[in-house]
């Protein structure tokens, strides 16, 4: 009898241990790994600004750690102001800046989306609040500096569980279980992930810094996703505008004409930002769904940018002078930049004579490596074969596309109408106060130097040569042409 009772107690104890073990595993899974649906946004614009493009799994940083890093490491930022000193934009008092999304995978994780590089800001005066323009090049954001700040913080001896939990406690009360998980799993894991990012992104250190408003979109794909050997090719280029994409689609959607499909361009951009292959598989499987909450996230991005229009020039325009400029434009510019976009086929680098580094950075070997990486997946992009031309982009919203040329090497349209030897050799990128006379952002002065990064056209990939069109015009014709370009 006693033996039977002892055996029964033993079985009960084993059962209790198993149940407790399963409960513990489910709890840990729920707190560390369980992925919840991404937040839903009613409008496509809000989705573009804050929605997920699948980067949280590979690149996501725990929200509470992300929030407190500028408070622990203010000395690693350009100045006081937290992430705003890197050009990140705040809108409507939201918890996250424009261009960052959050998805809960065990815990809330923060990562980039399309608007990080494609939402610009503009001010008429230094004291004004910024006007945020979705789809505009994010000329004010320092994407490389943002990544380097996160890496520098993780490399710092102050990146400890004690320091981070102490700062989190000043803002939010984690549960006892979450404090344990953060101390022993989440914080050490985040540090290791950021240090791996330092190793994976080492290819950037062999090239000139991007500076504000520029990025090498295909660098992460070449070296971090498809595993090409690191070389010295420089792919840094200006962040592109995303409006009127349907008009641009036939001619090519990147500076060098890669992709003639908006869908492919969106997928490639998400892949560059860190979207995982499983996420892309799942998202593309929903591409044909029409219900808003079940629709593909990237499909919503595509839908938003297909016919997105730029804002009008926000300063006075001399109508008579602009009318005279229209005649100059028809004679000097329309062959490549017709207002309807029909002529935007592109010119070979040898003809336009601009810096060719961006063209050389994507090769046949890289294209083949991408094909092997994507395999037979439904999201595999086409049109990634390297070419020898830069696209003659339509000029809609050209006023807010400064700096100019594919590598952002000319600060204003007035400067672009000068011969290359008379264009500024050094200027400051990233200041968002506008110069309506020269048609571009202010690129020198104390504030431009304080908030921006120096662009030196003597560095490889940064040359301001080429595109000599209009440089021989009389001064009055140039002035009229500038006035007309304000109307695009």
Name each model feature, range by range:
Residues 1-5:
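Juxtamembrane low-complexity tails/linkers enriched in Ser/Thr-Pro and polybasic
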Residues 7-488:
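Periplasmic c-type cytochrome electron-transfer domains
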């Amino acid at each position: 009898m006693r033996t039977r009772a002892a055996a029964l107690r033993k079985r009960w104890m084993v059962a209790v241990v198993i149940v407790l073990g399963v409960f513990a595993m489910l709890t840990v899974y729920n707190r560390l790994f369980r992925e919840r649906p991404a937040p839903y946004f009613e409008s496509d614009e809000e989705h573009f600004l804050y929605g997920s493009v699948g980067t949280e799994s590979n690149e996501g940083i725990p929200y509470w750690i992300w929030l407190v890093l500028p408070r622990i490491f203010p000395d690693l930022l350009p100045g006081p102001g937290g992430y705003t000193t890197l050009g990140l934009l705040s809108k409507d008092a939201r918890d996250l800046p424009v261009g960052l999304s959050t998805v809960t995978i065990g815990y809330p994780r923060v990562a980039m989306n399309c608007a990080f590089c494609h939402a610009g800001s503009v001010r008429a005066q230094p004291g004004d609040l910024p006007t945020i323009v979705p789809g505009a090049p994010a000329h004010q954001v320092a994407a490389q500096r943002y990544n380097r700040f996160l890496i520098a913080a993780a490399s710092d001896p102050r990146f400890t569980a004690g320091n981070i939990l102490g700062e989190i406690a000043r803002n939010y009360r984690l549960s006892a279980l979450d404090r344990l998980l953060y101390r022993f799993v989440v914080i050490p894991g985040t540090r290791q992930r950021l240090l791996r990012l330092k190793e994976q992104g080492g290819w950037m250190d062999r090239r000139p810094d991007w500076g504000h408003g520029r990025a090498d979109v295909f660098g992460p794909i070449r070296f971090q996703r498809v595993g090409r050997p690191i070389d010295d090719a420089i792919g840094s280029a200006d962040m592109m505008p995303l409006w009127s994409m349907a008009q641009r689609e036939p001619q090519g959607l990147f500076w060098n004409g890669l992709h003639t499909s908006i869908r492919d361009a969106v997928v490639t951009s998400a892949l560059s930002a860190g979207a995982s292959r499983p996420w892309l598989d799942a998202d593309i499987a929903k591409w044909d769904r029409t219900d808003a909450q079940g629709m593909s996230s990237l499909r919503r991005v595509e839908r938003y940018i297909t016919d997105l229009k730029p804002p009008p020039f926000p300063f006075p325009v001399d109508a008579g002078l602009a009318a005279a400029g229209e005649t100059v434009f028809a004679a000097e510019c329309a062959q490549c930049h017709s207002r309807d976009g029909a002529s935007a086929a592109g010119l070979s680098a040898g003809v336009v004579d601009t810096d060719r580094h961006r063209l050389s950075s994507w090769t046949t070997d890289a294209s083949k490596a991408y094909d092997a990486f994507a395999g037979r997946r439904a999201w595999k992009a086409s049109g990634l074969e390297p070419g020898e031309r830069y696209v003659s982009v339509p000029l809609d919203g050209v006023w807010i596309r400064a700096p100019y040329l594919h590598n952002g090497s000319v600060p204003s349209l007035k400067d672009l109408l000068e011969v290359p030897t008379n264009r500024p050799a050094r200027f400051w990128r990233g200041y968002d106060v506008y110069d309506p006379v020269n048609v571009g952002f202010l690129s020198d002065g104390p504030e431009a130097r304080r908030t921006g990064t120096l662009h030196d056209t003597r560095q490889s990939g940064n040359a301001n040569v080429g595109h000599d069109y209009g440089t021989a015009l009389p001064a009055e014709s140039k002035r009229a042409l500038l006035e007309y370009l304000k109307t695009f």
